[in-house]
């Protein structure tokens, strides 16, 4: 049986109540849920607007600045995947139970009959699942929104909805019914794959948020948006990697432990059809012929990673901590096929002084900045190989720039930008 949690993150007297309605937040199903949880927790406590925020340097404390009070945040989500985790377990919880699960027959068929070329779920079966579950979620949410509206009328509070991913169509439908302005985060190709289903949720949103102007441009080319807002992925570097000394020591030890320091080692993390599986099947043997010294280390699990193990210049390592990956590699490679959602691993590589080579699609150029090389979307294999060679030859300088650029997704900066978006859409 599916359960819906109402997670009370924080209450203040600011007169703003944020109502986040979505399928998953905690327990998180992936990075998108962790990102939104970080943003919501961030605006629930005191903090500055973007224009008042200091320049945040990863792993360093920030200077004191004027702070705004936190806002009230409620999260309406399914808990069918389990109980809350340390991500939000320090919050007060109110729990309500819903009678339907996250997955159903149609979502199961969509996955089992997924497209062999793209690796994406069967569109027809997935659409059938999404239509049904969004309809149910919307009806369930309406009961809570009605009481939230009554409470807001009595207190004079402003309401703002927030949603993302699979159940965002149902959440948006409920917000629209009660005249509640709302924000939608676009994280991946979902809305592009099901344009008719998600069009209303996006075009009627007070703002659509994405990580990177490039991604927002992709969204705006398909859906007429009222407002697009860049909110970077929030990464708490200190929580993930410790102190400056931890990161620098890890990198020094990793490089010192290498017995092949003259061999170019290129790291690839996570492989799916969207993240380059077909492309790597062409690139890896090409590089083996024209740059035989180079070696690729592929990290992650699943058939797509294993499918690259047959190339002589490639070693597959399975799931490995990011800090271990970037402790000893020379450069990092990431590509996408269609949707340019921000590659946060690019900036995590940068924190360790590792430059990246990526593709000119969506937000990838913004993620790389001047800390690596961007290859045109339709470039041939020779251009990719030359980019890898150039990045390797200039890895010291590009790595230094990548470390400087890592601050763009520091969670404190992202939270300040999200706080400013909320202020602007509500006209505070």
List PLM regions with ranges.
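Conserved donor-binding/catalytic core segment of Leloir-type glycosyltransferases
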Residues: 21, 209, 256-275, 281-284
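Short acidic/histidine- and often glycine-rich active-site loop of Leloir-type glycosyltransferases
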Residues: 360-374
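A charged, aromatic-enriched C-terminal amphipathic alpha-helix characteristic of glycosyltransferases
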Residues: 245, 379, 393-426
């Amino acid at each position: 049986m599916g359960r819906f949690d109402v997670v009370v993150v924080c209450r203040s007297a600011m007169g703003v109540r944020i109502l986040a309605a979505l399928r998953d937040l905690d327990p998180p199903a992936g990075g998108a849920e962790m990102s939104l949880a970080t943003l919501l927790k961030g605006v629930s406590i005191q903090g500055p607007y973007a224009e008042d925020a200091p320049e945040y340097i990863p792993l360093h404390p920030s200077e004191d600045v004027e702070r705004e009070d936190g806002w009230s945040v409620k999260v309406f989500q399914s808990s069918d995947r389990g109980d809350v985790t340390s991500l939000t377990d320090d919050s007060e919880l109110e729990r309500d139970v819903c009678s339907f699960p996250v997955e159903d027959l149609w979502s199961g068929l969509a996955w089992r009959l997924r497209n062999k070329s793209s690796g994406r779920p069967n569109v027809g079966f997935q659409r059938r699942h999404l239509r049904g579950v969004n309809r149910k979620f919307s009806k369930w949410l309406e009961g809570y929104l009605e009481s939230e509206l009554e409470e807001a009328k009595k207190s004079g509070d402003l309401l703002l909805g927030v949603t993302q991913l699979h159940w965002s169509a149902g959440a948006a439908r409920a917000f629209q019914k009660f005249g509640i302005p709302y924000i939608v985060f676009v994280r991946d190709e979902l809305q592009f794959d099901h344009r008719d289903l998600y069009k209303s949720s996006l075009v009627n949103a007070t703002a659509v948020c994405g990580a990177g102007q490039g991604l927002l441009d992709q969204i705006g080319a398909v859906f007429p948006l009222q407002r697009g807002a860049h909110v970077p992925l929030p990464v708490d570097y200190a929580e993930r990697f410790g102190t400056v000394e931890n990161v620098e020591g890890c990198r020094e030890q990793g490089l010192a432990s290498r017995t092949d320091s003259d061999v170019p080692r290129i790291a690839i993390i996570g492989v799916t059809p969207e993240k380059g599986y077909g492309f790597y099947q062409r690139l890896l043997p090409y590089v083996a012929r024209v740059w035989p010294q180079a070696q690729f280390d592929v990290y992650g699990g699943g058939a797509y990673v294993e499918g690259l193990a047959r190339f002589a210049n490639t070693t597959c390592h399975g799931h490995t901590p990011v800090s271990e990956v970037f402790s000893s590699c020379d450069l990092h490679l990431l590509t996408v096929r269609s949707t340019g959602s921000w590659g946060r691993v690019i900036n995590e590589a940068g924190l360790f002084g590792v430059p990246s080579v990526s593709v000119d699609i969506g937000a990838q150029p913004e993620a790389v900045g001047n800390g690596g090389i961007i290859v045109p979307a339709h470039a041939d294999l020779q251009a990719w190989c030359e980019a890898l060679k150039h990045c390797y030859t200039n890895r010291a300088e590009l790595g230094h720039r990548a470390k400087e650029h890592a601050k763009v997704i520091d969670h404190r900066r992202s939270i300040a930008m999200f706080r400013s978006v909320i202020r602007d859409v509500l006209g505070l």
